[in-house]
């Protein structure tokens, strides 16, 4: 049977289980989360990151995709003015 090697990942994910003996003293036992717990944790973190990314993208999309002609006209004029101020820099 293979013995688990200490890697930065397993060292970081070690957690301490504290158990009380009959005489009231506490003992510490180092334990590692099993693979299922690690995968659950990883999937939870990645899901949260993905939700945040989707929310940011959706907000950006909403800010850019305003269908009114007035908005598009104003935006085009701003870009044109900005372009004229910069001139040909190539």
Curated annotation (Swiss-Prot):
Spans annotated as Mitochondrial targeting sequence: 65-87
Disordered: annotated span: 1-31
Domain of life: Viruses
Any one GO biological process: symbiont-mediated suppression of host cytoplasmic pattern recognition receptor signaling pathway via inhibition of MAVS activity
InterPro entries membership: Flu_proapoptotic_PB1-F2
A Pfam family hit: PB1-F2
Site (Low pathogenicity): 66
Keyword vocabulary terms for this entry: Apoptosis, Host cytoplasm, Host membrane, Host mitochondrion, Host mitochondrion inner membrane, Host nucleus, Host-virus interaction, Inhibition of host innate immune response by virus, Inhibition of host MAVS by virus, Inhibition of host RLR pathway by virus, Membrane, Modulation of host cell apoptosis by virus, Viral immunoevasion
Gene Ontology CC annotation, any one: membrane
Localisation: Host mitochondrion inner membrane; Host nucleus; Host cytoplasm, Host cytosol
Quaternary context: Oligomer. Interacts with human SLC25A6/ANT3 and VDAC1. Interacts with host MAVS.
Homology family: Belongs to the influenza viruses PB1-F2 family.
Additional observations: Is not encoded in all strains, and seems to be dispensable for replication.
HAMAP family, alphabetized: INFV_PB1F2
Protein's job: Plays an important role in promoting lung pathology in both primary viral infection and secondary bacterial infection. Promotes alteration of mitochondrial morphology, dissipation of mitochondrial membrane potential, and cell death. Alternatively, inhibits the production of interferon in the infected cell at the level of host mitochondrial antiviral signaling MAVS. Its level of expression differs greatly depending on which cell type is infected, in a manner that is independent of the levels of expression of other viral proteins. Monocytic cells are more affected than epithelial cells.
Protein known as: Protein PB1-F2
Organism from which the protein derives: Influenza A virus (strain A/Beijing/39/1975 H3N2)
